[in-house]
Amino acid sequence: MKKLWGGRFQKTPEKWVDEFGASIHFDKTLVKEDIAGSLAHASMLEKCGILTEAEAVKIKEGLTSLLHKAEKNELDFSVDCEDIHLNLEKMLIDEIGPLGGKLHTARSRNDQVATDMHLYLKGHTEHIIELITAFQHVLIEKAEEHVETILPGYTHLQRAQPISFAHHLLAYFWMLERDKERYHDSFKRINKSPLGCGALAGTTFPIDREYSADLLGFDSIYENSLDGVSDRDFILEFLSASSILMMHLSRFSEEIILWCSQEFKFIELDDTYATGSSMMPQKKNPDMAELIRGKTGRVYGDLIGLLTIMKGLPLAYNKDLQEDKEGMFDTVKTVEGSLEIFAGMIKTMTVNKNMMKKATEQDFSNATELADYLAKKGMPFREAHEVVGRLVFTCIEKGIYLSGLPFEEFKKASGLFEEDVYIVLDPHHAVEKRMSEGGTGFKKVTEAIQKAKQCLNNF
């Protein structure tokens, strides 16, 4: 088959070269974006007098016909045409005749593919922000149900201090809020048009880049044609924001996996988000959480892969950039799927309040309350820390917890202890009294929920 770029060549590539060099098996994902870019380009060419009105109408009718076929999955792509751009150009020529070849006037595949990817990430970045917001609503709803549900807070995966479960959930709310901020910021660079930059140096035709950018909904255009066709920072920023988001989801997944284990029993996942074992009939595995934790690694790989591709490329376009798309598509699919699944998983999970509370009563996570108790009575905190540490050791030797220690032992450790020490040791009391800004006190958590709601309302 004769290549659309084949005029300079005396030989056609061998079949294996076509197979190796073709990108149509993955960049066909950009079919709608490519047609949208072509429709805008045709309108711009007409406005600038490069196409007649009749020519532009016929070209746009042909493109619209291809778009309808694409929506019905009726387009038959060929490796012989290499990529989405040449496939659609050939289809347009087949549809309306040689006039279809005029569409590529004042345009290169270099600015064409860059435009496609900007359009693709524009839509998906907006969608991801919407999915994050939906997940945040789920977290708020669940937090409202569990303001006074108490569980151990952990450091080093060791029980540290009792906290409100709502407080724990809100920690992820604010992580997701930062993720949204990162996507919003990256969107500024995504929302720029490279269309009209040509192969690298612009064009001799009197085009109007601002006009085509406006038709496509871009806020601005690239100021430098070399930069416009070779820039992939906007993809790297998207992949970076996605990597951080997936890291947050992976951390949450790890906790979900722990919490629904027999060792914790803090939650139970809905059957929809778990699977069984082919051998062990009793198993209920948190597969969705495990998959999200695992897929985080592949998103990291997509980012590192593109960074590695870009690090040695001279200006402007190089064929290496054909490899910029699969990781982008993969990350979009992974992030969108992970957010949808996680929101449903949290919304439908059952919280075992009794097991959470029981965990705070069978540990030493109230030891800090005891040290604070002494410090408030005038003892230097470092000395109080030492006194309570010795009491914890005494309890370990006796096989009891601080709340079960006889009052005489407290008095022996320090004369500052009074009978009210047992109130201080109650986990509910310990959580309730943590009223510093951003703390886990019930009133502060209730206020924090309102702040989170206001944050979403402002969005």
From Swiss-Prot:
<dbReference type="InterPro" id="IPR022761">
    <property type="entry name" value="Fumarate_lyase_N"/>
</dbReference>
<keyword id="KW-0028">Amino-acid biosynthesis</keyword>
<comment type="similarity">
    <text>Belongs to the lyase 1 family. Argininosuccinate lyase subfamily.</text>
</comment>
<protein>
    <recommendedName>
        <fullName>Argininosuccinate lyase</fullName>
        <ecNumber>4.3.2.1</ecNumber>
    </recommendedName>
</protein>
<keyword id="KW-0963">Cytoplasm</keyword>
<dbReference type="InterPro" id="IPR024083">
    <property type="entry name" value="Fumarase/histidase_N"/>
</dbReference>
<comment type="pathway">
    <text>Amino-acid biosynthesis; L-arginine biosynthesis; L-arginine from L-ornithine and carbamoyl phosphate: step 3/3.</text>
</comment>
<dbReference type="GO" id="GO:0006526">
    <property type="term" value="P:L-arginine biosynthetic process"/>
</dbReference>
<dbReference type="InterPro" id="IPR000362">
    <property type="entry name" value="Fumarate_lyase_fam"/>
</dbReference>
<keyword id="KW-0055">Arginine biosynthesis</keyword>
<dbReference type="Pfam" id="PF14698">
    <property type="entry name" value="ASL_C2"/>
</dbReference>
<keyword id="KW-0456">Lyase</keyword>
<dbReference type="InterPro" id="IPR008948">
    <property type="entry name" value="L-Aspartase-like"/>
</dbReference>
<dbReference type="GO" id="GO:0042450">
    <property type="term" value="P:arginine biosynthetic process via ornithine"/>
</dbReference>
<dbReference type="InterPro" id="IPR029419">
    <property type="entry name" value="Arg_succ_lyase_C"/>
</dbReference>
<dbReference type="GO" id="GO:0004056">
    <property type="term" value="F:argininosuccinate lyase activity"/>
</dbReference>
<dbReference type="InterPro" id="IPR009049">
    <property type="entry name" value="Argininosuccinate_lyase"/>
</dbReference>
<dbReference type="InterPro" id="IPR020557">
    <property type="entry name" value="Fumarate_lyase_CS"/>
</dbReference>
<dbReference type="GO" id="GO:0005829">
    <property type="term" value="C:cytosol"/>
</dbReference>
<dbReference type="Pfam" id="PF00206">
    <property type="entry name" value="Lyase_1"/>
</dbReference>
